Every structure is written in C-alpha cells, then in structure tokens.
Amino acid sequence: MAILIYMKIDQVMLKELAGVQSVGIYAAAVKLCEVWYPIPVLIAGSLYPAIIVVKDTNFALYNSRLQKLYTLLVWGAFALAIPITFLADWIIFILYGNDFSDSIIILRIYVWAGIFVFLSVVNNKWMVIENYQKYILLTSLIGMSSNILLNVILIPHYGASGAAFATLISYGFGSYLCLFFFPKIRAGFWFATKTLNPYSGFALLKHPK
C-alpha cells in the first residue's frame, strides 16, 4: 500500500511541477521495477512461520533466521538491480522503443529503490512479530513526508530523474536510516546494516540453513 501511495505522490507532483510528458516517461520505468515487488512478500510469507515458531524458545536461532531473511531479500534485490542497471537501455528500447529513451536513466535510478522495498518487507514482518506495528505506520509516514519534500526540491531542477532520486532517497530513509532514531526498532537498523556487509551475502550462500 505504501509503495502505491509513493508512486501516486510522485506522479501527481511530476504532473504539477514538470508536465504530463514527464509522467509518462517516469511511469514507464516504474512499471518495470514494480513487477518484482511481490517477490519479497512471497518469500517473507513462506519463511515467516519458521522464524516466529522459535522466537520464544530459541532467541539465538530466531535472530539467526531473521538475519538470513534480511540477507536473502536485500541481496536478492541487489541481484536484480545490478543487471537491470547495465541493461536498462536495451530493456527500454525493446519494450517501449526510441520514444522512451528518457526512461533509461529513470530505470537505472529507480531500480535501486527496490533494495529498500525488499528491506521494508522484512522490517515490517519483524515489527509485527515484536508487536511494534505502530512503527510500521510511523516509518511509512516519515518516508512519504521526505519523498514529498525531496520532490519539491528535485523535480523543478531534474524533472522525472529528480522524482526517481527522491523516491530512492526517501525509501532509504524510511526503510533503513530512520529506524536508528527509535530505540524500540533500532535492532532493525542493525539487522539491515549487517546485511549490507558483502560478507553476509557470501555467508548465506555458504550456510543457507
């Protein structure tokens, strides 16, 4: 739901600040990125029972499984973002043609927001387990507020690219950085920080269970 609101905010503000054409350019790239967004929901949903079942009986195993879910989703997002970044021009030309060449840079920026989208899925699952549901709404509101502010600053100067950067930064702030400022959910920040260490990805491959 939060992702849909972000997209609506971006497109409304783009229309008002940069014109209708920029909305089409932006939407073309965004549609390609959102195709992947159900993936973390499905993965987290399938692994969620194995995490919650050990919460009250084996805290070390609970943390280990939770950390592996963070790592799996975040590095899965990296695995999607890297090739799409390099193949963005080919993808846009094949799917939309030369008329949408301006969507290439949007795709290259916006695809990296997927890392924080994937991260937010596991964050939200963790907050539900810990009975911190109110922080799901709070962090979403913080992310959306920062998105609006950044759109106001960036769109007049950079158009659709500015909106893409605004989304990337606000996702990062709402799904990652802002968790540090709330003691009850600060553990989510540290889970994510550990996940962003490249060693975590290799460790998951070596010890997947």
Regions found by a protein language model. Name each.
Residues L179-K209:
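Membrane-proximal transmembrane or re-entrant/amphipathic helices at the cytosolic face
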Residues A27, F59-W75, A79-L87, I104-L107:
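Interfacial transmembrane-helix starts/ends
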Residues L4, K31-E34, A81, G114, ...:
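Residue-level recognition of pore/gate-forming positions within transmembrane alpha-helices
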Residues N63, V111-T139:
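Membrane-interface junctions at transmembrane-helix termini in multi-pass inner-membrane proteins
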Residues C33-F59, N63, W126-I129:
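Helix-loop junctions and terminal segments of transmembrane helices
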Residues Q21, F93, K134, L141-Y176, ...:
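Membrane-interface helix-loop junctions in multi-pass transport and translocation proteins
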Residues V20, T85-I115:
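Interfacial segments at transmembrane-helix termini and the short loops linking adjacent helices
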Residues M1-P49, A113, V117-V121:
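Transmembrane helical elements of multi-pass membrane transporters/channels
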